[in-house]
Amino acid sequence: MATTMKGLLKGLRYITQIFDEEKEQEMQIGFPTDVKHVAHIGSDGPTNTTPSWMNDFKTQEHEKGQVVSRGNSNKYNPQGTNQRGAGLKELLPSNTNEKPKQKTRRKPGGAASPNHNGSPPRKSSGNAASSDEPSKHSRHNRSAHGSTDSSNDQEPSVRRRRGGIPAPDTEVPNQIPDGSAPPRKATSRPRKLKGSSAGGEGSIKKSSKGKPENSVDTTCNDII
């Protein structure tokens, strides 16, 4: 019984596989060769009509081919390049009124060249140098006077420093603002402290008093 059941199951499986394959074939619509992809357009020949959106691409390709052919022909026909240059000149605006700028170089020792408008020439470099000389002399004189004035102003201060003369008291109040007392004069003498002087005197007195006692003791010892 088991073997018969296995044989029946195998037969059913085979039958089901056949039906499944038939169902898959029924779902297909037409053959793959009937479908035309974009890559297959134009393979049948120029007789078949192409879609409208392909016409634009063909016209652009045709124009590119003409441009390439023109560029290659210009190598052998230099007249073609001249014609193209003439066409570009016609498109550009004509600037006939503009004049080329002339670069003028100044001469090192001579006078400057006159202007194009007919104006008189400029002064020579020698005149300019002569006009600069008095200004330099005046500056030199001013600097000399300024140096002498500064030396005169500095002389009393230098003398005071060298001689050790103190500055007058009249200069101090001018620098002190109103309402403040003038500072006291600084004395160069050293001040003696009271404590130190008193201590010194006390030590001297003690030493003077102690001397006779020591001398008396020494004399007593000698006698004994």
UniProtKB/Swiss-Prot annotation:
Keyword match Nuclease: no
Additional information: Over-expression of RIC1 in tobacco germinating pollen reduces pollen tube elongation.
Effect recorded for residue 37 to D: Loss of interaction with ARAC11/ROP1
Result of altering residue 40 to D: Loss of interaction with ARAC11/ROP1
UniProt induction comment: By auxin and abscisic acid (ABA) in roots.
Encoding gene per record: RIC1
CRIB domain boundaries: 29-42
Knockout mutant characteristics: Reduced primary root elongation.
Organism from which the protein derives: Arabidopsis thaliana (Mouse-ear cress)
Superkingdom: Eukaryota
GO cellular component terms attached to this protein's record: apical plasma membrane; cortical microtubule, transverse to long axis
Keywords: Cytoplasm, Cytoskeleton, Developmental protein, Growth regulation
Protein name: CRIB domain-containing protein RIC1
Tissue specificity annotation: Expressed in columella cells from the root tip and epidermal cells at the base of lateral roots, leaves, stems, flowers, anthers, pollen and siliques.
Region feature (Disordered): 38-224
